[in-house]
Amino acid sequence: MARLNPNRRTRGLAILETALILPLLFVLVMGVIEYGWLFFKNQQVSAAARTACRFGITAPATTAETLAMCDTLMTKANLGSSGYTKTSTPCEVLAGTSVTVTITVPYSNIKLTGFPLPLPTNLVGTTTMAKEGPP
């Protein structure tokens, strides 16, 4: 009777376990990377909206200058070609009146991995601040 080598059997089992677990590990790693990218880009969009709104509430700023500041900030964040939209309430208002800047970026245009995960369709950064200046 031939004796079976126990090492050979264990080696085959390890390959089988690796083949079953490796795809799950790959999906987990890709999900972590994609969600990290999502949070990073969402922070950039929110920061751009906040900075543009801060610019818009200063006394001599106009709505057109505020929207141009959005373009500058989005280009600096490497989101200039992402197909984003920007809106601003009029900046030529009295002191104390609120000014709102909103930037919306379609997430499908800035995906990192393209891996099919449940992700939001848009990243939205909205900031509202009161207009500065003498009352």
Language model segments and positions:
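N-terminal leader/signal peptides at the extreme start of proteins
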Residues: 1-11
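Short, conserved structural patches
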Residues: 2-3, 42, 50-135
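Alpha-helical membrane and juxtamembrane elements of multi-pass inner-membrane transport
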Residues: 10-14, 26, 64-67, 121
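N-terminal signal-anchor/signal peptide hydrophobic helix marking the start
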Residues: 11-24, 35
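Catalytic tyrosine of NAD(P)H-dependent dehydrogenase/reductases that use a Tyr as the general acid/base
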Residues: 13, 30, 38
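Small-residue faces within membrane-embedded alpha-helices
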Residues: 21-23, 27, 31, 52
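Membrane-proximal amphipathic alpha-helices
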Residues: 34-45, 59
